[in-house]
């Protein structure tokens, strides 16, 4: 089984090609608020307190409907902080469900209740829950809050008791691969697979709070070794085949061919890592913002536009590394990903 082609994490190459031909969308990522009940030391958005003039329910619904009209099939509820701190999150989920769109929510799990988990299951919401470590001290340190491990484990248990993963409702555990948890990655991966849970394990991008904790990041050679071991485990134990490449184990990022992000103040940007606003949905329709953006055009044509050293790589046309990592490390979203081990001659890391 080719895991990437069958995984619920992405879209098929054929679907992406059709999206590019019609210059549309397949998904949109939404941030609701910067408010968060954790203070993760690697948080890309430095979430904590909410911002002024964050999007209203009406504005969020409008973005979702505009995305649907542009061809989006999936809405990814990132939160920006913790999505379940947004007071109207249940109305957002109901609306997406009524439109017949797929939806996924990324949560730290701390606010989950039995009732909420049943609601998510009933509305066919895919859930990705934070899960960086099985050790309380490590998880709490990474989350920046005492007791985080206990709350996360409780949330995971409640999701599984509600029926996840099952009946077309995938459950993911999300982890950043870093120095503190590198020895836990393989056992957590195996545990997830054995329970039908999708492991969403990604390398660290040095942005936000992670800039103050750059020692968290592992060198590319070590990330490569970890990903290769995970690939071998999947092949030998679970019959799943995928090629190890950054930035996510078992999954190649292709979101820049079909997606964008709208943050909690309405600014549109390519992804969480490329913090370059290309417009604001309070001033222009989403479709117009995307059509008029050179940045989006560059990224839709990434395999032609990317740094020359990547275009001659044997993996050119299949992989573009992490564009967010490239931008955060170099200031150029078309630069080679300095954490990529596939590109010949790459020895630099994002930990200068």
Which role fits each region the language model picked out?
Residues 2-126, 218-219:
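Conserved alpha-helical substructure of the radical SAM core
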Residues 1-9, 55, 69, 99-102, ...:
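Radical SAM enzyme [4Fe-4S]-AdoMet core and its adjacent flexible, acidic
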Residues 83-84, 112-113, 136, 207-209, ...:
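Short secondary-structure capping/turn micro-motifs that flank functional sites
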Residues 30, 34-37, 247, 265, ...:
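Processing junctions and N-termini across compartments
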Residues 2-19, 24, 46, 273-352:
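Flexible mid-to-C-terminal extensions adjoining Fe-S/redox cofactors in radical SAM and related proteins
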Residues 60, 223, 286-289:
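Hydrophobic/aromatic residues in well-formed alpha-helices
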């Amino acid at each position: 089984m080719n895991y990437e082609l069958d995984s619920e994490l992405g879209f098929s190459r054929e679907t992406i090609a059709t999206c590019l031909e019609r210059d549309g969308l397949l998904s949109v990522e939404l941030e609701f608020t910067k408010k968060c009940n954790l203070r993760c030391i690697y948080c890309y958005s430095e979430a904590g307190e909410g911002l002024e003039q964050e999007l209203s329910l009406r504005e969020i619904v409008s973005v979702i409907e505009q995305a649907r009209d542009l061809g989006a099939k999936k809405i990814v509820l990132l939160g920006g902080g913790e999505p379940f701190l947004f007071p109207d999150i249940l109305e957002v989920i109901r609306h997406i469900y009524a439109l017949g769109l797929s939806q996924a929510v990324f949560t730290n799990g701390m606010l989950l209740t039995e009732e909420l988990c049943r609601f998510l299951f009933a509305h066919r919401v895919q859930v990705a829950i934070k899960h960086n470590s099985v050790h309380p001290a490590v998880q709490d340190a990474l989350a920046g809050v005492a007791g985080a491990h206990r709350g996360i484990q409780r949330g995971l248990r409640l999701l599984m008791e509600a029926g996840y993963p099952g009946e077309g409702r995938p459950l993911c555990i999300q982890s950043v691969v870093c120095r503190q948890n590198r020895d836990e990655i393989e056992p957590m991966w195996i545990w997830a697979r054995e329970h039908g849970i999708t492991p969403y394990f990604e390398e660290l991008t040095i942005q936000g709070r992670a800039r103050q904790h750059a020692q968290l990041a592992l060198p590319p050679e070590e990330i490569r070794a970890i990903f290769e071991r995970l690939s071998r485990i999947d092949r030998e134990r679970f019959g799943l085949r995928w090629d190890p490449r950054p930035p996510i184990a078992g999954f190649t990022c292709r979101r820049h061919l079909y997606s964008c992000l709208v943050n909690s103040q309405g600014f549109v940007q390519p992804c969480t890592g490329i913090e370059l606003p290309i417009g604001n949905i309070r001033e222009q329709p989403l479709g117009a913002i995307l059509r008029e953006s050179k940045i989006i055009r560059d990224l839709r044509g990434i395999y032609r536009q990317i740094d020359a050293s990547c275009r001659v790589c044997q993996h050119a046309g299949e992989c573009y590394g992490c564009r967010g990592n490239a931008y955060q490390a170099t200031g150029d979203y078309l630069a080679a990903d300095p954490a990529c081990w596939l590109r010949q001659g790459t020895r630099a890391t994002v930990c200068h």
